[in-house]
Swiss-Prot record:
PROSITE patterns attached to this UniProt entry: PCNA_1 (PS01251)
Chain ranges passing through the membrane: none
Assigned keywords, A-Z: DNA replication, DNA-binding
Gene, per the UniProt record: pcn
Provenance organism: Methanocaldococcus jannaschii (strain ATCC 43067 / DSM 2661 / JAL-1 / JCM 10045 / NBRC 100440)
Subunit structure: Homotrimer. The subunits circularize to form a toroid; DNA passes through its center. Replication factor C (RFC) is required to load the toroid on the DNA.
Identification of the protein by name: DNA polymerase sliding clamp
Family to which this protein belongs: Belongs to the PCNA family.
Amino acid sequence: MFRGVMESAKEFKKVVDTISTLLDEICFEVDEEGIKASAMDPSHVALVSLEIPRLAFEEYEADSHDIGIDLEAFKKVMNRAKAKDRLILELDEEKNKLNVIFENTGKRKFSLALLDISASSVKVPEIEYPNVIMIKGDAFKEALKDADLFSDYVILKADEDKFVIHAKGDLNENEAIFEKDSSAIISLEVKEEAKSAFNLDYLMDMVKGVSSGDIIKIYLGNDMPLKLEYSIAGVNLTFLLAPRIEG
């Protein structure tokens, strides 16, 4: 069995919105400890991983199941969530469906057919990064939007004094500079200077669910995948993005 109740359907909608921009489908690995999932995007450029501990739920009951979901259908359902709706997720093993229920003055129930997909063997690799930056999510998102004016990729740079997001087009360029003592920087731990380029569309998709007040943890090195971590309503999201190879 599986049944989980969350206080805010709208908050979980942000999670589904974010991962559905990168993935078409996903297999949720459910057990008594919570829910885990990881998958590569179809182009094998990005890895998406999420963890929902049982403490993120108001109520939670589960034994071990793999629940395959079409994320486009899940997104359409979650878009129907209202501001004060509670979210109930429950597995109907007899009908092989996941019931998505919004509870407020009444109950609205949607039943999603399960996909026959196995849990991904792809996991977030254990990589030791030389640099870790913690930055306010809204500041990072705004810098990416600025970069999007001129380029389809960004160069992320870090040294012991600052974190820089640089974009350069054919004629124009822009730069967002966050000094170590900037109000946007929570912490800047740099062991070696780093500079790497990344696809901007992927980065913007990865931070789609970030709201004002959220903190993003950025792991950066030279010629290493970029790693991003942040949480939405107790759901822990991790993304890896391959660096852009300069021609």
